[in-house]
């Protein structure tokens, strides 16, 4: 495989990695970014078509396919990236997902086998640095620092939470139960889960972002780069079922979700 220029942009969440990838892609004549979530791919697609002729922008996920005949820029879930496209720029977001038990093989395949003709950008956490170095390619590392500081504020009852707050739960049943409790006590909450249809998810995000409701209840998937205007993030539990067992969240997972 031809050696390729790689830029690895590493840092915690909320450090502008995705923004940098978008701006870099748009500086090339063609490009593609693979995201970990359908909702994030859609969010970036909506932002880009506000800047670029929509006829030049494609969205490809497991649920949505908008592919203009003259598309130059592709926003995809990692699984849906068209690997046969010859594009100047390729970006892969949340590259640390290579270690994920369920989806890691897909991220690893993209890490090893998909390249931009002029630049490949890998965005993710510092835990990936040694692995990226082992690719033995022409690699530049950019370290990103968090824009905002996370601080622990302790426990709070739902009746006492402030507006612009998200509560993270780890099952659909719990998400709906918490949202119903907030509706009774606070007047309403938006819900964001990967299992919702694209139309419903987008409507729920808009409901919160427009200020129609002041609270958000979501699964931990919201930590994968989805940008929401939040002041506080609470966890309904610090344990989650990882597909094999119920276990405690580690500090990096807490930072990823809350950040």
Predicted regions and their residues:
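Walker A/P-loop
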Residues: 2-20, 133-135
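Conserved interdomain hinge at the start of the Helicase C-terminal
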Residues: 20-25, 102, 106, 112-114, ...
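Conserved strand-helix element at the start of the C-terminal RecA-like helicase core
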Residues: 29-44, 120-123, 160-185, 189-193
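Conserved RecA-like helicase motor-core motifs
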Residues: 52-63, 142, 185-198
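Walker B catalytic acidic pair
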Residues: 78, 93-95, 237
């Amino acid at each position: 495989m031809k050696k390729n220029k790689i830029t690895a942009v590493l840092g915690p969440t909320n450090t502008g990695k995705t923004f940098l990838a978008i701006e870099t892609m748009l500086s090339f004549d063609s490009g593609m970014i693979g995201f970990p979530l359908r909702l994030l791919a859609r969010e970036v697609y909506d932002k880009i078509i506000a800047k670029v002729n929509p006829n030049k922008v494609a969205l490809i996920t497991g649920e949505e396919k908008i592919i203009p005949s003259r598309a130059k820029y592709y926003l995809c879930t990692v699984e849906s990236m068209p690997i046969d496209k010859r594009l100047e720029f390729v970006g892969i977001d949340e590259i640390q997902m290579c270690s994920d038990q369920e989806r890691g093989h897909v991220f690893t395949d993209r890490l090893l086998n998909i390249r931009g003709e002029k630049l490949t950008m890998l965005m993710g956490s510092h835990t990936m640095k040694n692995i990226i170095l082992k690719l033995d390619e022409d690699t530049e590392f950019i370290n990103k620092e968090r824009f905002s500081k996370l601080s622990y504020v302790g426990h709070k009852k739902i009746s006492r939470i402030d507006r612009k707050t998200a509560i993270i739960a780890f099952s659909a049943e719990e998400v709906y139960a918490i949202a119903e409790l907030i509706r009774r006590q606070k007047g309403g909450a938006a819900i964001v889960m990967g299992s919702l249809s694209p139309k419903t998810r987008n409507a729920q995000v808009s409901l919160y972002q427009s200020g129609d409701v002041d609270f958000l209840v979501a699964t931990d998937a919201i930590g994968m780069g989805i940008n929401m205007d939040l002041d506080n993030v609470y966890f309904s539990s610090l344990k989650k079922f990882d597909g094999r067992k119920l276990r405690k969240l580690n500090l990096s997972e807490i930072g990823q979700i809350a950040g």
